[in-house]
Amino acid sequence: MEVGEVILTTQQLKQVLTIEPDNQEVYKLFNKLNNPFVVGAPVPPDRFVGRKSLIETAFDQIYNRSNLAIWGGPGMGKTSFLELLASPDVWQEYGEEPSQAVMVLFSCESIQPFTASGFWQEVLIELMDKLDSEPDLKSDIETLLDQGKATARGMRQVLGQLGKRNKFLVLLVDDYDAALRENPHYTQADIEVFLSECRSIAYQSREREYLSMIVTSLKRFNELGPSLTPDQSPWYNHYLFVVLRPLTETEVDTLLQGIPITPALRDVIQNMAGGHPALLQIAGSLLFRELRTGKLPDTETFAKEFESQTRHIFQDIWQRCRDVEQGLLILMAWSKLKGSLEQKITVDLSDIDLVFSQQELDLYSLEQQGLIMRNQDLEKPVYLFRSSIMEQWVIHKIQTSDKASLEKWETILLKLINP
């Protein structure tokens, strides 16, 4: 049921209860109308909004048995997107035939501690659960697992068997960052071997025609994983890279359609959420909760509640930024900071525009992460925070910093000024 339909049905049931307050059947129906916005969990495929071009790109890659790497910051909808691609209904909606595809979806974070053998074991176990119609192949996979052959070589054997049955594997891997981090059981050398094996299967082996691999990460791969050397091909060059950007205004309108909000409240949501999918789900959930009680919150009350509900997201975003990115965010907020910090931070920041002109790549990275936007209507680019709360969070973070933290920010800012 669409958001607008849920709200309309809620209003109709409330009218009935006004006339018949003892009608228990209507009361039960009223309580069953769940909030259509999803907070703290992936958005189900039937409530997924937008990303049409990216969905089409993903199906193009699957059709060609090629590979896709999707990256985006916290809450940008990576897991929701993978779950969408795993839905047979979505395949049919986009004119694709799901019967030959065996779809396996899991998160690398579920493998603790992450190891290459743990990865292949997880793939084979999940694959086995999808092969009830192929008992012989299911038995072969079980034998591989029992014999401790959950390896890249074993995976190639299974892909070959899938191909003989006119099937192929769509491997949807969330949180691929975990495969690029060392741990006590997974060394840098192990990482390099694992990535080489993945590239070999997906790009070089005969069995590649029975596999399409789609992975997600918080950052683009060239910022993660092993460094490249002149004598090696990039370990990630078999992927097409796409970034999950904030939702467009049209997509935001679609998400919030049917909610009778004032233009002022709509502007507050746009200003505070900035098109960020997780923030918009929280905003929609808060609004729906209030509407179900028969009232619409005023902008000030809504803003306070929204800020309280989203503080952890902004903290997560900040902590995941590199030092140079944090420094650039501080510079963007400097006009509102300098009055209270000019005695504490003594770095000469009189020519911030020059710093920005020298840091275009890192600013572009922040732009792609959906944290800032560039206004190019003026003679020179002007960078703005996408979310007013993110700007407030940066300001508060610096204003409440102790001496050691302020010295750290000074060092970062000096490096930006003198690259």
Name the predicted role of every residue range.
Residues W71-V104:
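P-loop NTPase Walker A phosphate-binding motif
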Residues Y239-L265, A283:
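Conserved small helical "lid"/interfacial subdomain of P-loop NTPases
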Residues E25-V49, S53-L54, D136-D140, P234-N237:
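Conserved adenine-nucleotide phosphate-binding loops and their immediately adjacent elements
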Residues N67, A150-R220, L228-P230:
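Conserved Walker B catalytic segment
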Residues K52, I261-L361, S365, Q369, ...:
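Winged-helix-like regulatory helical subdomains adjacent to P-loop NTPase cores
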Residues I125-A150, D175-Y186:
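Conserved P-loop NTPase mechanochemical-coupling segment
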Residues S388-N418:
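Short, amphipathic alpha-helical interaction segments positioned at domain boundaries
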Residues V102-V104, C108-D136:
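Conserved NTP-binding/hydrolysis module of P-loop NTPases
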